[in-house]
Design a protein with these regions (language model features):
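The catalytic Tyr-centered alpha-helix of NAD(P)H-dependent dehydrogenases
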Residues: 140, 151-158, 188, 192-196, ...
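C-terminal substrate-binding subdomain of Rossmann-fold SDR/epimerase-dehydratase oxidoreductases
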Residues: 10-11, 23, 64, 81, ...
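Short aromatic-enriched loop/helix-cap "lid" or pocket-rim segments at secondary-structure transitions
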Residues: 48-51, 135-139, 190-193, 224, ...
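N-terminal Rossmann-like NAD(P)+-binding domain of SDR-like oxidoreductases, especially those catalyzing
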Residues: 1-185, 315-319, 325, 329-339
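Residues in well-ordered alpha-helical elements
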Residues: 70-73, 92, 99, 110, ...
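Hydrophobic alpha-helix immediately C-terminal to the catalytic Tyr-X-X-X-Lys motif of short-chain
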Residues: 161, 165, 169, 199, ...
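Short alpha-helical segment that forms part of, or immediately flanks, the ligand-binding pocket
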Residues: 99, 200, 219
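Structural element of the ATP-grasp superfamily
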Residues: 112, 166, 199, 292-293
Length: 339
């Protein structure tokens, strides 16, 4: 194992988004000596309420764009590391309009790497298992760090591009970097456009949930707090230049997840509508996190998916004021796409 890195001041890009804000909460709750600067553009998916109430002497919000090189030159000095979560990440949006994905996911990563190169700090790159493409439903294989890249959507192709930039800058310029590729996250603060919160909030509103295709597509679910603990372990204990896959053996097909949500909310498990499948919808994702567990000793804490799902449902029921402002615009966008 590498020498343990003990950062005192870190930048978290996208720290007002779903996964990024949960990482900020994790750091504040578990590592009291660390100060976090959140850099977030506050797009539709970034909500400052996600980090409201955290101690002001521990967390500072800088509203800005990761593509702004002058801004990065001002805020990066004095920090020990950047943890890069900021991304355009919704597949349906990438199909409708890929340009913002290229700018944020590719150019934004380039700008951050240049800032890291200039100021000599560490960098952890948060990525997705979607860069590997998909697996057959009857294939027992899982993605590993050696799986070839086969991105199949505008979103995943931009994330694959950003991963390659990190590797190239690491090799060419000697940057101190790590990369993680994670499976599908669930938990609090996730935007209502995403699969699980969309179903939950539709049921709260008395609207029949909608399911793509035949519902057979499989996702490997992980609670976002487990993702956060894994990223921290990789940042502080990971070997420089290495990639680690993060997963919790949470494979479920979409129809199973939807039926679990319906039953947990007291509804008939068949009370949903079928809609046309997403173009190019990946069939199955599955992560093998053996390397992460073996080298760094990481283990997921939220291994009961049904319990984690119940806690997530309870959070959305209790926090309608958080998700309500985005709900109508999100559903209008889905209606326009026939979904």
């Amino acid at each position: 194992m590498s020498e343990i890195f003990e950062p005192k001041n870190i930048i978290v890009t996208g720290g007002c988004g779903f996964i990024g804000s949960n990482f900020v909460h994790y750091v504040v709750n578990n590592h009291p000596g660390v100060h976090v600067t959140v850099l977030d553009k506050l797009t539709y998916a970034g909500n400052p309420e996600n980090i409201a109430g955290l101690p002001e002497d521990r967390v500072e919000l800088v509203v800005g764009d990761i593509c702004d090189a002058e801004l990065l030159d001002r805020i990066v000095p004095g920090h020990d590391a950047i943890v890069h979560y900021a991304a355009e990440s919704h597949n349906d949006n990438s199909i409708a309009d890929p340009e913002p994905f290229l700018r944020t996911n590719v150019e934004g990563t380039f700008r951050l790497l240049e800032a890291v190169r200039k100021h000599g700090i560490r960098y952890h790159h948060v990525s997705t298992d979607e860069v590997y493409g998909d697996l057959a439903l009857d294939d027992p294989a899982k993605f590993t760090e050696e799986t070839p890249y086969r991105p199949s959507s505008p979103y995943s192709s931009t994330k694959a591009s950003s991963d390659m930039l990190v590797r190239a800058w690491t090799r060419t310029y000697g940057l101190r970097t790590t990369i993680s590729n994670c499976s599908n996250n669930y938990g609090p603060y996730q935007h209502v456009e995403k699969f699980i919160p969309r179903q939950i909030t539709n049921i709260i509103d008395g609207v029949r949930p909608k399911l793509y295709g035949k519902g057979e597509n499989v996702r490997d679910w992980i609670h976002t707090e487990d993702h956060s603990s894994a990223v921290w372990d990789i940042l502080t204990k990971g070997r420089m230049g290495e990639t680690y896959l993060i997963g919790a053996d949470g494979e479920k097909n979409n129809i199973t997840v939807l039926r679990m949500i319906l039953e947990a909310m007291g509804r008939d498990p068949e009370d949903f509508d079928w809609v046309a499948d997403r173009p190019g919808h990946d069939r199955r994702y599955a992560i093998d996190s053996t390397k992460l567990q073996r080298e760094l000793g990481w283990r997921p804490a939220h291994t009961d998916f049904a319990e984690g799902l119940k806690q997530t449902i309870d959070w959305y029921v209790a926090n309608e004021s958080w998700w309500r402002p985005a709900k109508e615009a999100t559903e209008a966008r889905y209606r326009a796409q026939g979904q």
